[in-house]
């Protein structure tokens, strides 16, 4: 895509901070509250994760990251070798142009290179476009995990890396 770039950045990068504020406002609009999951820049440090910033003609329009998660962290639904997607977001003005799919593919590739075996994520019923993206990209429902695992609106999905999308 002409003008589209993806760059690894720290989670506390100023442009990421602005996008996180925007996605939190979107969560409030859809769910009545923001996402209280605690994330730190260290979660995405080299080898244990990555955080990507997508720009279109130099303007930040997308972000997303993965962090290493393993069974010994004691969380139901997690397995050794998991990479958890966090803060996947494309700004409204850039949606429906394939950027989320490009970002997702880059995150999956990065996780695979780092030796992660499965990508897991938590989303919700008020984000049907996200659920559709993940299902069409080979993700399937999995055991609930995370801060919102007891919420009826929570949906957890997983994809084994190295498998082509089904459908």
Over which residues does each language-model region extend?
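C-terminal "cap" of GNAT-fold acetyltransferases
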Residues: 4, 8-13, 17, 117-120, ...
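Alpha-helical hinge/cap motifs
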Residues: 87, 100-101, 124
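Active-site acidic-Proline motif in GNAT/NAT acetyltransferases
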Residues: 91-93, 97, 125
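Acetyl-CoA-dependent GNAT
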Residues: 3-86, 91-92, 104-106, 110, ...
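Residues forming the Rossmann-fold NAD(P)(H) cofactor-binding site
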Residues: 97, 101, 105
């Amino acid at each position: 895509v002409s003008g589209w770039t993806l760059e690894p950045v720290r989670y506390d990068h100023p442009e990421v901070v602005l996008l996180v504020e925007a996605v939190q406002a979107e969560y409030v609009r859809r769910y009545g509250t923001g996402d209280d999951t605690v994330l730190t820049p260290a979660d995405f440090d080299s080898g244990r994760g990555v955080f990507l910033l997508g720009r279109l003609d130099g303007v930040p329009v997308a972000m997303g990251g993965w962090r290493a998660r393993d069974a010994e962290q004691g969380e139901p639904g997690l397995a050794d070798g998991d990479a958890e997607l966090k803060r996947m977001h494309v700004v409204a003005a850039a949606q429906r142009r394939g950027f989320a799919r490009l970002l997702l593919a880059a995150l999956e590739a990065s996780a695979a290179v780092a030796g992660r075996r499965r990508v897991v994520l938590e989303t919700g019923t008020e984000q049907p476009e996200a659920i559709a993206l993940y299902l069409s990209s080979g993700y399937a429902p999995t055991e609930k995990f995370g801060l919102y695992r007891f919420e009826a609106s929570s949906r957890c999905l997983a994809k084994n890396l190295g498998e082509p999308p089904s459908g």
